[in-house]
Swiss-Prot record:
Belongs to the Nudix hydrolase family. RppH subfamily. A motif (Nudix box) lies at residues 38-59. PROSITE patterns: NUDIX, NUDIX_BOX. CDD domains: NUDIX_Ap4A_hydrolase_plant_like. GO terms for biological process: mRNA catabolic process. NCBIfam families: PRK00714.1-1, PRK00714.1-4, PRK00714.1-5. It comes from the Bacteria. The keyword Hydrolase applies. This is RNA pyrophosphohydrolase. The gene is rppH.
Length: 159
């Protein structure tokens, strides 16, 4: 599902632990790290997609997490031209994302990245809240900055 402007609806997941660190996941067979994220299917709400992606990508269920906050609007990024599939219709030029800030309320041993036939990640670690800004691929950096900045007060408010 791609909107009329060429952006694919998507959810981004910032999963925190009790120390305020965030789960940082390594893309399979790559030295590239990112937050879990994934597309919203036509029949899904962003929250439905959040729970589906959370399970597919990190093996967690609804009862393993608490939603602390969600971005108010959609945050967009454009794909670099080399990643745009110019022969696909409709043409997708980027993603528009709703970002969710979650707190892990179960044991971190429940995190599993091998539950699907095609896992997206092969490793993970806890990092400081702002660490991803200096590490994520350049074209996603501004969306990460905006999401982290908007959601940070909600993380701090629970302390």
């Amino acid at each position: 599902m791609i909107d009329p402007d060429g952006f694919r609806p998507n959810v981004g997941i910032i999963l925190t632990n009790d120390a305020g660190q965030v789960l940082w996941a390594r893309r399979i067979n790559q030295d590239a790290w990112q937050f879990p994220q994934g597309g919203i299917n036509p029949e899904e709400t962003p929250e439905d997609a959040l729970y589906r992606e959370l399970n597919e990508e990190v093996g967690l269920e609804r009862e393993d997490v608490e939603i602390l906050a969600c971005t108010r609007g959609w945050l967009r990024y454009r794909l670099p031209q080399r990643l745009v599939r110019t022969h696909s219709q409709p043409l997708c030029i980027g993603q528009k994302q709703k970002w969710f800030l979650l707190r892990l309320i179960s044991n971190e041993q429940r995190v599993r990245m091998d539950l699907t036939g095609k896992p997206e990640f092969d490793g993970w670690r806890w990092v400081s809240y702002w660490y991803p800004l200096g590490q994520v691929v350049t074209f996603k950096r501004e969306v990460y900055r905006r999401a982290l900045k908007e959601l940070a007060p909600r993380l701090l408010a629970r302390d």
